[in-house]
Amino acid sequence: MTQQLNVDPAEIKKFEDMASRWWDLEGEFKPLHQINPLRLNYVLENANGLFGKKVLDVGCGGGILAESMAKQGADVIGLDMGKEPLTVARLHALETGTKLEYVQSTAEQHAEENPETYDVVTCMEMLEHVPDPLSVIRSCAKMVKPGGHVFFSTLNRNIKSYLFAIVGAEQLLKLVPKGTHDHNKFIRPSELLKMLDQTALQERGITGLHYNPLTDTYSLGKNVDVNYIVHTTL
């Protein structure tokens, strides 16, 4: 009996259709380019650097975070189920001379083949796009080495996140395409922590990611009402 993949075909198609514009700094993925230095620095600071470490980026898309981690001297594999985003990621790595590998697979499949393999696992802006986020979290826990670091980022589910991420970002400011997110799939920090409790991962810190529409800039802070990042260790 074939195991059902933890994949939403509609989500895959959504990002396949936008793949060619992944590295357009003024396109649909501009917010990802803007927040990437913050995400990268958060990982660097909490994982004590990445140089020489084996790193997996789950749900890597077109490779924005994966490529930036490779440039820090990490041995990076980017994992995604979208064929077109991975094609774009590979081409961009060739253009920039960045050495890393991209694999088309689910977290679950990769975990079966690569247990306790990585020093650092990142899973950013991905959990809200799969049918079973707990399954992805369990897979990340399985793939990291004992003592290793796993980072998750997603969106909180409340009225404020609906107003900011759906009404504001998608409908008014048009920071991302309409339909990019489904508010019902957003994950409260308390829910994410309960999922972590079902694994061996230990939460080490949580921080919010904030957008200032007046300055068109992002920053990290204590408020986790909308976007947030969680640092865990095994």
From Swiss-Prot:
Q: GO annotations under biological process?
A: methylation
Entry's EC annotation: 2.1.1.222, 2.1.1.64
From the UniProt record, list the reaction(s) this protein catalyses.
a 3-demethylubiquinol + S-adenosyl-L-methionine = a ubiquinol + S-adenosyl-L-homocysteine + H(+); a 3-(all-trans-polyprenyl)benzene-1,2-diol + S-adenosyl-L-methionine = a 2-methoxy-6-(all-trans-polyprenyl)phenol + S-adenosyl-L-homocysteine + H(+)
Q: Where does S-adenosyl-L-methionine bind?
A: R39, G59, D80, M124
Do the record's keywords include S-adenosyl-L-methionine? yes
Query: Under which pathway is this protein filed?
Result: Cofactor biosynthesis; ubiquinone biosynthesis
In its UniProt record, a GO molecular function of this protein is: polyprenyldihydroxybenzoate methyltransferase activity
What InterPro entries has UniProt attached to this entry? SAM-dependent_MTases_sf (IPR029063), UbiG_MeTrfase (IPR010233)
Keyword annotations: Methyltransferase, S-adenosyl-L-methionine, Transferase, Ubiquinone biosynthesis
Could you name the domain of life of the organism this protein comes from?
Bacteria
**Is this entry keyworded S-adenosyl-L-methionine?**
yes
Cited function: O-methyltransferase that catalyzes the 2 O-methylation steps in the ubiquinone biosynthetic pathway.
Family the UniProt entry places it in: Belongs to the methyltransferase superfamily. UbiG/COQ3 family.
NCBIfam families recorded: UbiG
Q: Tell me what this protein is called.
A: Ubiquinone biosynthesis O-methyltransferase
Q: Which organism is it from?
A: Aliivibrio fischeri (strain ATCC 700601 / ES114) (Vibrio fischeri)
Encoding gene (name): ubiG
